[in-house]
Amino acid sequence: MVKKISRNGSSGKRESILRAATRVFARNGYFNSKVADIARAADVADGTVYLYFKSKEEILHSIFDQNMAEAITSGRKLIKALSDPREKLRRIARLHLERLGADRDLAVVFQVELRGSTKFMEEFSAAGFAEYLDLLCKIFEEGQRSRVFRKDLNAKVVSKILFGALDEMATNWIISHRNYKLEPMADVVMEVFLNGVSAE
């Protein structure tokens, strides 16, 4: 059982361990990484890591949970004052790629390491990922009610299509040998998503 630590002075060390783990997982791969590697990168003893996390798997979960929560909170704040559902989706799309583009190690963990097994995918799909898709879905449903978006489309499917497009942009950015900024790709995705590819 993990020892409970008071909040006073503990959050900084926990954050340091998570940042170190993100670097280690991105560079070595999750399955090739050890808690000792994370401790070394965080400049703490192995036992210190176990004061905050039960296992390497819990560390990976914590990286996901924390970053998804931050993305969802930031997204909701970003669109709070907006009324146009199209602009809301544009802002969320930019934020999605901006966050990943600002931290390549985090992007590698999200796009590659979290997908290393079916078990991980099932667990993470049931967690913050579902809440993120729900945010997209609710914006699209808002647009359907205001007749901005087509009413004959399934909002849940549409939200997955949008996420999938952004997700592929992030994955391609990671594996590409070209040096370019990721965030502007959100505008390309949204142009196609909102206006389609047919010439009319």
Label each region the model flagged.
Residues 43-53:
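Short hydrophobic/aromatic patch on the recognition helix
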